[in-house]
Amino acid sequence: MRCYVFPGQGTQKKGMGRSLFGRFPDLRRRADRVLGYPIEELCLENPQRRLSETVYAQPAIYVVNALHWSAAQEDLPPADFLAGHSLGEYSALLAAGAFDFETGLTLVRRRAELMGQVSGGAMAAVVGVSEQIVEETLKQHDATGVVIANYNAPEQFVLSGSHEELARIKPVFEKVEGVRAFVPVRVSGPFHASAMAPAAERFRSVLASVDVGGLRTPVISNVTGRPFGPDAQEVRALLAEQIARPVRWTDGIRYLRDAGVSVFTELGESKVLTSLIDRITTAQEPTPDPRRDLIERIKREILQPEIGDEALGFDEDASFRRLGLNSIIYVRLARRAGTVLGIPVKPDVIFQHRSCAALADYLLTRDDIAQAIARAAPPEAPPAPLREYQDERVTALLHGCANGTLSVDRTIEAIRALA
């Protein structure tokens, strides 16, 4: 499955959207009408360094993200999920059909105005250590006014707090073993922290009058790390809360991975999220678990051929007696285990260790059997080769489907169009 992700504030830069404004002039004109100033000039020229100001940066990023989304609709296959980091969440909701472009831009502009009114704070990124170490360091040095505002990756966090407190703890973190960087984030306030609560409440009243439609594609909420529900009131509530609550980006990406997403494509002027996702997915790779693997092999390769698919859902700690096995079946299971493991296994072994877990535990204590298990572990199957067709266009389409560039439906439609 595929997910498109949209970056948020901090990714703005002079020249953003240069290759796309000319391609989608109608979107530029609509943005100019809502904002009352030329968005293309702001993005390409950055007059008076306005992109460093929240009130200008957020609308600019939203518009440029929308340009990239417009291009993606023409050039890329559809998404199964959408997600955006902080401000980028509005781009994801736009792509999902929650509101139209103008409504989203109006919300973003008002959000930026309210957030820009909160002064006296800043944000800084800590890279290289775990959440526990970050929390312990803050606690040990009485940095009670500094909180984790973004959970960006297992070893990357963004802190929110006052300028003074962040300046005080900077040298502290730089001396912590493992910390690779402590750097300021390009925002104008202590976002996603309790200092933003007044802005969040005022924004809640703005959202109350906005019509939020049903989502055509699931969107991950920054507040929960889970998809928004179908209730429009819930969407409004979470958008308001997001201003003063931490961004749980790591939780959201882990949810998507568990849901089966294997392809993440960042739409915007940054590859920051791509880097974060790589760190999250690398850290999420499961460590080898010989016991778990052996239990699954016992179910799949020894039990299932004898008793059927019931074996796959059978409780690993439940006794084989619950399956109604007789002595003949025990003998057959022993023979099959011997075939699978490549060494003789006596029926008594099965009879005395009458659950998948107990049998696995016993087998792993036997050096000869453990070595046989390692030898017998099935190699990872290579991907099935695609049949080569004489028509190179068909071959290209099939390869695109195989590597995830094209969906199955689009591949079928494209092949039919060639007929």
Which residues does each PLM region occupy?
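Active-site catalytic pocket residues across diverse enzymes, especially alpha/beta-hydrolases
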Residues: 20, 98-99, 141, 173, ...
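Conserved small-residue
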Residues: 6-8, 31, 65, 88, ...
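Flexible, low-complexity linker/boundary loops enriched in proline and small hydrophobic residues
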Residues: 5-7, 202-204, 220-227, 232-253, ...
